[in-house]
């Protein structure tokens, strides 16, 4: 996602994580909370914050800050209804599972893939995009294990 949004490859990554919310995950060698910083050759900084525990639903948001402002995509709620009163704002809960939230996106992605193959075109994301995502994931793991940033 960072490569897609910035249009650039990452040149450095630093990752840190812990398993304080669910120690059983830590006992298996994994983390329940992680933070990742990435940097491009041009100096663009990408910050990622992950947690496996959001008691209020499937929380996934994105913000992109730039010289002209900021754009944000927030959580999808069970409905678009919002109530504002003396107590503040009330909304329906956020969708609780990624399959609910991304069902349409997965369907559209699959349709694109099939259409690209039928027309002899390259699908997007490409195999190269997948390879680069895997390299970033591997580098993030190395960084978290060593406590050092990893140059890419």
Feature-to-residue mapping (PLM):
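Rossmann-like dinucleotide-binding domain that binds NAD(P)(H)
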Residues: 1-45, 51-56, 128
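Phosphate/oxyanion-binding loops and surfaces in catalytic or ligand/nucleic-acid-binding neighborhoods
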Residues: 4-8, 67-71, 143
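NAD(P)-dinucleotide binding in Rossmann-like oxidoreductases
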Residues: 22-28, 40-108
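An acidic site on a long C-lobe helix of protein kinase domains
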Residues: 32, 106-109, 126, 132
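C-terminal helix-rich "cap/oligomerization" subdomain common to oxidoreductases
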Residues: 41, 115-152
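Short amphipathic alpha-helical/adjacent loop interface patches that line ligand
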Residues: 68, 110, 134-137
